[in-house]
Amino acid sequence: MSWQAYVDDHLMCEIEGNHLTSAAIIGQDGSVWAKSENFPQLKPEEITGILNDFNEPGTLAPTGLYIGGSKYMVIQGEPGAVIRGKKGPGGVTVKKTALALVIGIYDEPMTPGQCNMIVERLGDYLIEQGL
């Protein structure tokens, strides 16, 4: 299965009538493995900030989590494994795997829990595969 198929079939899938606004699988080196059409362009410093927070949980909390220039308030995640952010009625979930970052961005009517489930389910699968 191509990386694009993982994004299209497993991240942009419908859940209870809702789906993510955009999603991507990004290598920890910053390379885009696959993304939805409208996923924002990540800046190198945004990827560095995300990786730093996974290595030292809490480093993004004071400044916020930035994805494509949009600022998200960091909310409770799982230190070293999942970063969650909130912005108005939407937000973002970032799951770290051995080699990649799985990122899902949502807006109402999708709920934070639905976004978490979609992103973390694929992330857990990739971890099981050694990716």
Curated annotation (Swiss-Prot):
UniProt xrefs under SUPFAM superfamilies: Profilin (actin-binding protein) (SSF55770)
Main location per the UniProt record: cytoplasm
Assigned keywords, A-Z: Actin-binding, Allergen, Cytoplasm, Cytoskeleton
Compartments reported by the entry: Cytoplasm, Cytoskeleton
Record's keyword annotation contains Metal-binding: no
Chloroplast found in the keyword field: no
Gene3D superfamilies: Dynein light chain 2a, cytoplasmic (3.30.450.30)
GO molecular function terms listed in the Swiss-Prot or TrEMBL record: actin monomer binding; proline-rich region binding
Summary of subunit composition and partner proteins: Occurs in many kinds of cells as a complex with monomeric actin in a 1:1 ratio.
Function: Binds to actin and affects the structure of the cytoskeleton. At high concentrations, profilin prevents the polymerization of actin, whereas it enhances it at low concentrations. Has a high affinity for poly-proline.
Protein name as it appears in the record: Profilin
Species of the source: Citrullus lanatus (Watermelon)
Taxonomic lineage from the root: Eukaryota, Viridiplantae, Streptophyta, Embryophyta, Tracheophyta
